[in-house]
Amino acid sequence: MKLGILSQDIKLYSTSRLYKTAKKRGHETEVVSYLRCYMNIAKAKPRIFFQGREINFDVVIPRIAATWTFYGAAVVRQFELMGALSANSSASISRSRDKLRALQLIGNSGVEMPVTGYVHLSRDIESVLRTVGTPPYVIKLLEGTQGRGVVLTETMEAAISAIETMKKVDANILIQEFVSESSGQD
């Protein structure tokens, strides 16, 4: 079986373990930096190139960093269109990184969670803050992971200032009530 591991670096522990295990089991295996892949999107003939040569695999194992979800998922989708099986589908990669979608589904299912607001226009910030509750507020970048892009604001004014600052760079943000029992854990 021809196996492609889509990763930024073979030196990453998980990538090197996958590579060694696949080789040990007799698979023709290659680690490919998905950021260095480029695609040719044409009628009925999707193609992917890496370092100047066309590549194709029977199976791909995506190791896509959160920062590169959009591009990484596009590369995986192109392999899927070429007939490769993927350990994680392009759709599942995209969905798993969509915090807003996950929160909407969790909230709709009745699971306890912090009250969360989402707003597009700056003029509606104060209104959405009131729907979330009273300060403190947790302000989160939708694209942030592992605690990056999270701000705790103690007052409504501080929350408005933080949100307006994030909005200046067209960031999508979530506003959540602060749950004191969480001890600062997300």
Where are these regions (language model features)?
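Short catalytic-loop micro-motif centered on adjacent basic/acidic residues
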Residues: 4-6, 61-62, 88, 114-116, ...
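Short glycine-rich, flexible loops that bind phosphorylated cofactors or substrates
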Residues: 68-70, 146, 182
